[in-house]
């Protein structure tokens, strides 16, 4: 049973281990209870940095989590207050995000989607029975208990959850994540439990086709779509979805919350409770591919937001996220060939799934091509799709006609946005330094590589098998034993480089990397990876401080 203690020090009962995640005022670390050797995840909140309102939110989160005991909810086991810190001890869930697990499966069907939403609805029904509304149901908060096949889906993060009075509706403030907000919240009407069902409808839609029902780069237009309930079931991807699945989505995405299906009713829907006979068993490969792109886009947005926090630590007065379009970057003079494709009108030509492992070969005279805005053809989600908002002072809306891209992250002291000209020059600079880094890798030139990278470079890459790698030793092994010893030709193409300028001294670039190489049998091959790099400028010099790459383990393509 979860208990609150103010006299017992956390370290008396638990031993802390590695960091699992980090927020603005908190860090999550693995811990072990000394008396039982049971593993948990400890959310450690620095209460010295919290406002009075934040303290109230922390108390609310702990109070709510203590109520909830369900196999599909991440459980709170302990709540300990100390001088300056508060510790929330939760289940240690090791399976990662549900959506990431789905794209790694060899087989995924409508019946699997039904099983997923069944577990999500079980968790939602449980919290609603306890008069709790989550308010932030989204893929990032749907985790798997373990990496074992068939592991339970667990609902996490009750930081925005509220306590309600039965079915009573009230205005609890503007809170949630843009793509998952309900019409009543956007209208600033009284709301309650039905907002969670609306979010479940959005999640179910994504589970079936891999993209969301409402999406637009402009947050104002996105909100107009949601308030109008303007979604459809386009061909051909929806042609293979059963009518029963569409019926459940329609009942979840009903504009009028009073007529929206409840969690208990949804659990009794034939598509959920009789999935073995009602839901289709056909493998949905297109859904998996679309979902992989959707996941990559979510991760990019998360990386940008994290980098903004890091940038504010470097220079609190310079934290401004520039989200202007990258189309129109002109051809530059550099050591590599640069070819620009015509700009497409596609709003999400950002990332694409990896098809083959990274090649083992490098070249004596590598070439790098940069291609901007190549057509991708995948339906996209809003730029703000994974950014959680809470504003109980009723200031959550974007003013009429104003894009979400015009908004900035909160900061103690922000400077005016850089001019369009200087921003474009900065973006060209980031693309060029990224190109030089890739050339250093293709040349097997570790010395040049180290001059462009921060000594404490952190990275998530396939070769590290999902682990966070810090420092240069891991990369040095590949340079010494593989990259520098190969002489076969290689050509790298950087597709759709998207640069986000973060203040004066930080930037993030995301791109698709195509590598043409000759395999061991002398045949030409092409591999693909999606990569994100975070750059920080120190003493006038750009250094790569973080790197994230998709794909299967092979040779590193840092």
UniProtKB/Swiss-Prot annotation:
GO terms for biological process: cell differentiation; insulin secretion; long-term synaptic potentiation; nervous system development; regulation of calcium ion transport; regulation of neuron projection development; regulation of neuronal synaptic plasticity; regulation of protein localization to plasma membrane. ATP binds at residues 20-28, 43. Expressed in skeletal muscle. Its EC number is 2.7.11.17. The modification Phosphoserine is found at residues 311, 334, 349, 352, 419, 484. Induction: Activity is induced in skeletal muscle during exercise. The active site is at 136 (proton acceptor). It is a peripheral membrane protein. One of its GO terms (molecular function) is protein homodimerization activity. Residues 14-272 form the Protein kinase domain. It is an enzyme of class 2 (transferase). It catalyses: L-seryl-[protein] + ATP = O-phospho-L-seryl-[protein] + ADP + H(+); L-threonyl-[protein] + ATP = O-phospho-L-threonyl-[protein] + ADP + H(+). It is linked to Intellectual developmental disorder, autosomal dominant 59: An autosomal dominant form of intellectual disability, a disorder characterized by significantly below average general intellectual functioning associated with impairments in adaptive behavior and manifested during the developmental period. The CAMK2 protein kinases contain a unique C-terminal subunit association domain responsible for oligomerization. This is Calcium/calmodulin-dependent protein kinase type II subunit gamma. It comes from Homo sapiens (Human). The lineage of its organism: Eukaryota, Metazoa, Chordata, Craniata, Vertebrata.
